[in-house]
Design a protein with these regions (language model features):
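Short, hydrophobic/proline-enriched secondary-structure or compact coil segments at domain edges
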Residues: 14-23
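Intrinsically disordered, low-complexity segments enriched in serine/proline and basic residues
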Residues: 1-7
């Protein structure tokens, strides 16, 4: 898997935990990483777990809020307290490269994305990642690499807030292939994108996908 060591100019350091609401985020971090350098953010202090639902409601009802920072001396404990307020689900996907160093992207819901999907009952999460890439792009015989990162994305379904944890793996593919986007999953295109051509694609994607590329350059 090619390293993304040349991408530093395009991305900023990721705080400890980001929970994405489409293109907005609640960020749980240490006090020194909080909103002081981010003019578009609001900083809120979590007194106890009972505050979490009201923070989520505030964020949902205020679309002009791009980011809420929750500073904490113990970000892991705070993150766990936030997670229990959601119905948690697991998913996995892959950052796939070929022998030329091109990356496999898909077009879904009008934005560029990486192939991913939900974990099935009893399935190892790395198996989920390979299966979903195969199903969504038609690429098989993938070589599984290291775990890159886990991203968090929340959404409301049937009146219930869900928090999706997505495990992202490096993958490689060495043979020619005819890409076959999974149209029943609203995927309209699958394409190999050269490293040099990535910036405009990454301007037309989700922040969580940018995070995957950011973390991959550190792998």
């Amino acid at each position: 898997m090619p390293k993304l060591s040349n991408f530093g100019a395009f991305f900023k350091t990721i705080p400890m935990h980001r929970i994405y609401f489409d293109k907005r985020a609640i960020i749980i971090c240490r006090p020194e990483e909080a909103a002081l350098t981010d003019p578009n953010a609001v900083e809120l202090h979590l007194r106890n777990a009972a505050d979490v639902p009201s923070y989520i409601s505030l964020f949902e009802s205020t679309p002009t809020l791009d980011r809420i920072y929750i500073p904490s001396d113990d970000p892991e404990s705070t993150y766990k307290a936030v997670c229990v307020e959601f119905k948690e689900v697991n998913a996995a996907g892959g950052l796939v490269s070929n022998r030329r160093g091109d990356f496999l992207l898909i077009r879904r819901d009008g934005l560029w994305d990486l192939p991913k999907g939900h974990q099935e009952a009893g399935e190892d999460i790395s198996v989920t990642a390979i299966r979903e890439v195969q199903e969504e792009t038609g690429v098989d015989n993938l070589i599984l690499g290291d775990l890159i990162c886990v991203t968090d994305h929340c959404y409301r379904r049937n009146g219930i807030w869900h928090l999706k944890h997505t495990w992202w793996y490096q993958m490689t593919y060495d043979a020619p292939v005819d890409l076959s986007p999974q149209t029943e999953e609203d995927i309209t295109k699958a394409a190999w994108v050269a490293r040099s051509s990535l910036p405009p694609f990454l301007k037309d994607t989700y922040p969580s996908i940018k995070e995957v590329f950011t973390e991959a350059r550190q792998a």
